[in-house]
Amino acid sequence: MNTFFLRALAVSGLMSLTTACVTSTVDEMTFNEPTEGIGDSSVVILGRRHSSDYETEPDFVACVGDHITSHDESIRVIDELEFLNAVYPWFEPRTAPLYPKNIEQLLQQKPVAEKMLALKLEYLIWLDGSTVRSDGAGSMACSFNGCFGFGTWSHDANYEATIWDFTDQAEVGQVNTSASGQSYMPAVIIPIPIIAPVQGAACDGIGDQLLEFLSSEY
């Protein structure tokens, strides 16, 4: 039996035993929850952008919003970019309010107050965090015959959602979620990535908790 076949057989067996796995945890602290949902009011979910080189991933922000609306279509989640354009420049990194006490000062700007009224904005949810990839292990070699080898790496996701009540101008809750997972890339001629859905697990975890706060159905 030639070496090519033995190596292919060994890695094929490893592929059959390998699945990406994810572990996640969620912590919640909320108060003054709406008892019957938010009615015809709206909510906006924004990623924190502390500087030009740091921002919560826009795709994660969109994922959380989609999770909420897909489970309760009665909740109106304003698109992040739509909101930022509507209230420009008041929510740019240098001008965005950092604390609920800044809401009163923000609403003193007539264009902002009028826009918030038109949007029927009840809750603003800040998302802060990121998903990072750690150093991997393993090796892989490729030639005209294909690729052989095995690689692995991990992802860690940590996010915090802070809920502001625009009417009461107060913080009414926080949700923290963390997730970690191991991804793999076995290769028998063709590399086949087996990706751990770490960011997706974090999105589902934080989205479920926000649904419990916002929706009358949960």
Task: Label each region the model flagged.
Residues 21-41, 50, 118-119, 131-134, ...:
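C-terminal/domain-edge helix-coil "capping" segments
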Residues 56, 60, 64, 108-112, ...:
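Stable alpha-helical elements in mature extracytoplasmic
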